[in-house]
C-alpha cells in the first residue's frame, strides 16, 4: 500500500511527466518544427506477445498526431489544455472523473479545445498515459464507480480521505461484499485464509455462490467482474495473484463476448495494451462455461447470432486465443451453433454449480 509520502512522490512524478510533454510541444514550436505526438497504433493487428512478461502488448506500428492539419492541430490543442488541467489537479491534490473532464472542457476559454464527446476525452487520457508512461490513476483521474466487489477470507487495510480502515471481506461486509476502490494500490493485504481467487462475470451467479456459502466452504475470494471488468477489478485480481500467490480462475458465460472478458483478465485488452503488465494476470485460467459443458450437461441454450459467429471466427485469429484448447472449444461452438449462460446450470438445480460443476472443474484444473 502507498504511504502518504509515497503518494506525494508519485504525484510529483506524474506532474513532471505531463510538464515534460508540454515542454516537448513548446520546443518543437521554438525550433520551427510542426508539433507531433507519436503513439502506438491501437488495433488487433498491432498486438504482439511479450514472451518475457507473458502478456499482449502493442507492437512497433505507430500513429502520429501532427499539427500539420486543422484536425491534427485541434487534437494537440486539446492535449495541451488537458495536460494543464491534470497538472493543476495534481498540484492541488484533487481528483476528478473522466465524465467531469468532458464537461469541464466546456469552460475552457478556447472553444476549439473543448471535447465533442466523452469518447474523445477518454481516448486523449489514454494517449497521455501511453506517451507519459503514467497511469490515469496517477493523474488522479477515475471512471464512474463500476460497483465490482470482493467476497472472501481476506483482511485488508484501505487508505481513504478519512484515514485508514481495516476490513474483513466476509465478517465486516454485507451480502454485497467489499466494493473495489478506484485505485486498488491504496489497499494493503493484512491476512487471508484463501486457497484461490474465482472471478465471476455475472451478478446472478456471484449471488448464487455467496448464498450457497461457496466462499466459506472452499476458502475462495470471489471477485465479481460485473461484465467487462474495470481496470480496478483487473488490477486487484493481479495483486491477489502476485502479492498473495493465489491461483486465479475465471467463470463466465459460454459465448464469444465472455471469452473476451476472460482474455482481458489474463492477457489484457487492445484498448489498454500499454498497461498489460500492470493489469493482466497471464496465469489466470478459464473454468467455464465451455462449449464442451453445453454438450456434456445438455444445458439450455440460445442459437448463435450472426454477430456471435463473426466474433468466434475473429477469435480464431486473435493472438490471445492461439492455443489448442481455445481452438478446440471455439470450433466446437461453431459446430453446435449454440451458446449458454452461467445460470443455465440451474437447470440441474440451484446447488449443482457449487456442489458438482465447480468442484469437478476445479479438481480437473488442479485447484481443488
UniProtKB/Swiss-Prot annotation:
Asked whether the keyword Isomerase is assigned, the reply is yes
Q: Name one GO biological process term.
A: DNA topological change
Q: What is the top-level taxon of the source organism?
A: Archaea
Q: Which UniProt keywords apply?
A: ATP-binding, DNA-binding, Isomerase, Magnesium, Metal-binding, Nucleotide-binding, Topoisomerase
Tell me which cofactor or cofactors this protein depends on: Mg(2+)
Domain called Topo IIA-type catalytic: residue spans: 9-148
Per the database entry, which stretches of residues form a coiled coil?
Answer: none
- Xref: Pfam families: TOP6A-Spo11_Toprim, Topo_VI_alpha, TP6A_N
Q: Return the EC number.
A: 5.6.2.2
Kindly list the GO molecular function terms attached to this UniProt entry: ATP binding; DNA binding; DNA topoisomerase type II (double strand cut, ATP-hydrolyzing) activity; magnesium ion binding
A GO CC annotation given for this chain: chromosome
**Which residues of this UniProt protein bind Mg(2+)?**
201, 253
Its quaternary structure?
Answer: Homodimer. Heterotetramer of two Top6A and two Top6B chains.
Would you identify the family this protein belongs to, as annotated?
Answer: Belongs to the TOP6A family.
Q: What protein name applies here?
A: Type 2 DNA topoisomerase 6 subunit A
